[in-house]
Amino acid sequence: MDSIRIRGGKPLSGKIRISGAKNAALPILCATLLSDGESLLRNVPALRDIETTSALLRFLGRNVETAPPLVKVGAGDNVRPEAPYELVKQMRASVMVLGPLLARFGRAKVSLPGGCQIGTRPVDQHLKGLEALGATIRLSRGYIVAECKRLRGAEVVFDLPTVTGTENLMMAAALAKGRTTLVNCAREPEVEELGRVLNKMGARVSGAGTDVIHIEGADELEPFDHAIISDRIEAGTYMVAAAAAGGDVLIENAPLEDLEAVAAKLRQAGVEVGREGDCVRVRREGRPLRAVDVTTAPHPGFPTDMQAQFMVLMCLAQGTSRIVETIFENRFMHVPELARMGAHIDVDGHTAHVHGGAPLSGATVMATDLRASASLVIAGLVATEGETEVLRVYHLDRGYEFMERKLAQLGADTARVEGRDG
């Protein structure tokens, strides 16, 4: 397994460009199952999760050509509406093939999902919604087995906002007969992006990006050509990295309008954040950081996917900050690794108290999930002595395109070491 080595203590300066959004590309790749013909996705990042989804689509019978930032998906000769454990276990977003397969072919057999181990993250809301549209669903030996004639539009009320659940139901409803109304939907920009693509394909989607979405299903859908939006979480990660390491960084293609909750907390902490041309500028030169409290929330609140990175920033601030995780259970697995570097953090259930001000030191640490791995890289950037080695960076490669190279562009001393066991 590869690792990343970092020698910290250097301020960051310069300019980097943000890649396409992984969390937008994955459901849009799944949406290609809804039509024949060749669809073209542009601005697709070169990530492990994109490779996994492409492999899954090939297994299902699609022709997939991947040459990021371009991915082509065309109809194959034989459709196999079964997503096996060997592929789905690698990434929980694989469950999003369930809705398209069921709507298009009348049956689907999809393994229960895997991916980052940050809580149970159940799929019950997906199944409840598909049953409301007329599907018959059973669980058999670790698989979801779903069947239907043609799905029919209905009202589905989610018990809680779920991004992948909202997206799965949107795709299924795009081929359902009649009108579907989804209530208490996730409002993330990636959901809105999927709505744009489904409209290009011939469905009529309104309200995507709000808590109520209406979908008028079509008898058949067309292939599409679409450029993926920028990755707001990647942008937020580099904003926090620039704030933590200090310096002056321009982040090109960063969707600041989707990061207002993160930008507001950075400003409260004493960091300058603003627009400069087509870039977001993040600057902290010589100013101390202030401790601020953060509570994660569904969009447009503070994203759970930025919690670990922001915790590292608060390790450097004077005073104690409180970080409350409301979205996922078991999402403080980075805390013991940060403690190895000298962080003082107390965890009580869903709340972490970060006692900042003590310097971090380099250490060998182990990534446990995607965003935790990014937080450990940021911690390595600010470690005042010694070298940091982050093991198991295959987690990082699931969601960050060439992170060590982009940081090196900004002056960081980072390098990938191939083949390190961990």
UniProtKB/Swiss-Prot annotation:
Gene Ontology molecular-function annotations: UDP-N-acetylglucosamine 1-carboxyvinyltransferase activity
Compartments, as annotated in UniProt: Cytoplasm
Residues the record lists as 2-(S-cysteinyl)pyruvic acid O-phosphothioketal modifications: C116
Enzymatic reactions: phosphoenolpyruvate + UDP-N-acetyl-alpha-D-glucosamine = UDP-N-acetyl-3-O-(1-carboxyvinyl)-alpha-D-glucosamine + phosphate
Metabolic or biological pathway: Cell wall biogenesis; peptidoglycan biosynthesis
UniProt KW keywords: Cell cycle, Cell division, Cell shape, Cell wall biogenesis/degradation, Cytoplasm, Peptidoglycan synthesis, Pyruvate, Transferase
Pfam families (UniProt xref): EPSP_synthase
Similarity remark: Belongs to the EPSP synthase family. MurA subfamily.
Protein name as it appears in the record: UDP-N-acetylglucosamine 1-carboxyvinyltransferase
Source species of the chain: Sorangium cellulosum (strain So ce56)
